[in-house]
């Protein structure tokens, strides 16, 4: 089984071909292809290539499946004994992708 570790949106993801993944929002239309050049590691069976910091010539190709928002994260700020409470919520945007190829 081959897999790779990519960097996008300030986070690292371990990806394999055919896998679906929710990442930070990308400004790319649904159905279009996206290429990730920042590949930190590529493994193909027993052969593992680790980049310093990235693997030269490696890229991961994916297709944008959908755009959406995660479930709401709710927070409450509360001050004891002061009869003060503040409720807030946030929904983060995401892009769902399908990994179509790993090239090393």
UniProtKB/Swiss-Prot annotation:
According to the UniProt record, which cysteines are disulfide-bonded? none
Q: Fetch the Pfam families from UniProt.
A: Ribosomal_L21p (PF00829)
Keywords on record: Ribonucleoprotein, Ribosomal protein, RNA-binding, rRNA-binding
Signal peptide (from-to) = none
The organism's superkingdom is given as Bacteria
A GO cellular component term found in this entry reads:
ribonucleoprotein complex
Which molecular function term from Gene Ontology is one that the record holds?
Answer: rRNA binding
**GO BP term, example:** translation
Tagged with keyword Zinc: no
Assembly and partners are described as: Part of the 50S ribosomal subunit. Contacts protein L20.
Briefly state the protein's biological role.
This protein binds to 23S rRNA in the presence of protein L20.
Q: Family assignment?
A: Belongs to the bacterial ribosomal protein bL21 family.
Protein name, entry field = Large ribosomal subunit protein bL21
- The protein's organism comes out as Pseudomonas putida (strain W619)
Gene expressing this chain: rplU
